Design a protein with these regions (language model features):
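Conserved beta-strand segments of alpha/beta enzyme cores
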Residues: 4, 64, 90-92, 188-191
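Conserved SAM/SAH cofactor-binding pocket of Class I
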Residues: 13, 19-124
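C-terminal beta-strand of the catalytic ATP-binding
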Residues: 116, 206-208
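Mobile active-site "lid"/loop adjacent to the S-adenosyl-L-methionine
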Residues: 116-147
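Conserved Class I SAM-dependent methyltransferase catalytic core
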Residues: 142-206
Length: 208
């Protein structure tokens, strides 16, 4: 992402794979604006250090962001990073669970890198991840799908026509996310984007 981010034990360390998610959202928001000067609005769910939201703001000067996290400690880190990058005027931070703080607002994009590690796999993670990064930012339920299910079920109502939901996916989860969306009449076209290792890493769902 090319920007410096402070991290603490309250947030995940930004991963190289997340650059794929940021680039995917940037490309699609740029296309949506058609090179014009109109303001764009996006929301980042589970913002953590703010790396995704702040990277988008840095590279998209007409973008306004809402960043949500259930952790007050994580939001404190994200606010520090926003101040250090001089981006505070274009971002609002909301403490709350997933999509709930978005009530009454509409966006061109919703982006999330949610917890997606199956609970039984946590013990097998590298010690520097398992022992030092917040479990709440890692564990995604029995199959790692709990947060994807909630986001796919609820995000469309907060998207403007032609808007999209972009999700970072764990290994072998992109297809399952697509299958969830295929059953939901709110979603139309799907895209799957591979990471640097050729793994399906980002799922983009377009609102009908």
């Amino acid at each position: 992402m090319g920007l410096p981010f402070k991290v603490t034990p309250a947030v995940l360390v930004p991963r190289p794979d997340t650059e794929i998610l940021v680039q995917a959202v940037m490309d699609r928001l740029k296309a949506a604006s058609s090179g014009g000067d109109e303001s764009l609005r996006a929301a980042d769910i589970g913002t953590g250090s703010g790396a995704i939201a702040l990277s988008l703001l840095h590279y998209l000067p007409t973008l306004q962001m809402v960043s949500v996290d259930i952790s007050a400690a994580a939001l404190a880190v994200a606010r520090e990073n926003a101040a250090a990058l001089e981006l505070t005027e274009r971002i609002a931070f909301c403490e709350g669970n997933l999509l709930a703080p978005l009530a009454g607002h509409m966006f061109q994009a919703i982006v999330s890198n949610p917890p997606y590690i199956p609970v039984d796999d946590i013990a097998g993670l590298a010690p520097e991840v398992r022992d030092y990064e917040p479990r709440t930012a890692l564990a995604g339920g029995p199959q790692g799908m709990d947060f994807y299910e909630q986001l796919v079920a609820g995000a469309a109502v907060f998207l403007a026509p032609g808007g999209f939901l972009a999700l970072e996916a764990g290994i072998r989860q992109a297809g399952a996310i697509g299958a969830l969306a295929a059953k939901d009449p709110a979603w139309g076209r799907q895209e799957i984007i591979k990471d640097y290792a050729g793994i399906d890493r980002v799922v983009v769902l377009w609102k009908k």
